[in-house]
Amino acid sequence: MSMGPAAGEGCGLCGADGGGCCSRHRHDDDGFPFVFPPSACQGIGAPAPPVHEFQFFGNDGGGDDGESVAWLFDDYPPPSPVAAAAGMHHRQPPYDGVVAPPSLFRRNTGAGGLTFDVSLGERPDLDAGLGLGGGGGRHAEAAASATIMSYCGSTFTDAASSMPKEMVAAMADDGESLNPNTVVGAMVEREAKLMRYKEKRKKRCYEKQIRYASRKAYAEMRPRVRGRFAKEPDQEAVAPPSTYVDPSRLELGQWFR
């Protein structure tokens, strides 16, 4: 037969009167022992248990308060001596210009988090694998392999030598239009045409001119009123010639005798 808590005692969890565990928390310790430890429902006079701090994502509660919350921020904890001796370091992801909010999963150092260990050993020589050489010799070899040739008065560098020799020869044969002498001749001809156009433009006169001397003489003879040509007055009508013929002058008598 179980006996209830003594009078004046409080519940170990909620502080209700009765001591020990009240009727609401008496059977909770059976299903959730990690939430309600046995010390919470112990007998009379048991002190109230301290507040429990639950660690998520595999973080243990060891260490001071600063270490317990360091995984919530963007600062990685220093590597352990064993990992440092083995050459394993925590490497931050490269910055791509996008500021991401701090993630609770990124700063977990336990077994259940998303921690990446990257070996920062000797970097493989990719240049040697690509046949480009390494160190200062790479630039020397590239400079030695460069091909510099003259093309129509200008120079260009074919360092990669990706253009076939046949194509280069064809371009050199078809480059007569880019001959410096041809270009200079075209420029001189253009300048001559421009000078002729300017001289012809200077001689232009947009005022009224009389091109023929006969027109000029006729214009001087015509009367003017205030500088303008005036209409000439009507002349008297000339009498038409008489059609009467004197028969004596025609000597018609000798024909009709």
UniProtKB/Swiss-Prot annotation:
Tissues in which the UniProt entry reports expression: Expressed in the apical meristem, developing leaves, leaf sheaths of young seedling, root meristem, epidermal layer of developing stems and branch-primordia of developing panicles.
Residue positions of motif Nuclear localization signal: 198-204
UniProt cross-references to Pfam families, sorted A to Z: CCT (PF06203)
Modified-residue entries (Phosphoserine), positions: S68
Observed effect of gene inactivation: Early flowering phenotype under long day (LD) and natural day (ND) conditions. Decreased plant size, number of grains per panicle, yield and dry weight per plant.
Expression induction: Circadian-regulation under long day (LD) conditions. Expression increases during daytime, peaks at the end of the light period and gradually decreases during the dark period.
Region entry Disordered, spans: 226-245
GO BP term, pick one: flower development
Domain of life: Eukaryota
GO MF term set: DNA binding
Quaternary context: Interacts with HD16/EL1.
Function: Probable transcription factor involved in the regulation of flowering time under long day (LD) conditions. Plays a major role as repressor of flowering. Controls flowering time by negatively regulating the expression of EHD1 and HD3A.
Protein's recorded name: Transcription factor GHD7
Lineage: Eukaryota, Viridiplantae, Streptophyta, Embryophyta, Tracheophyta
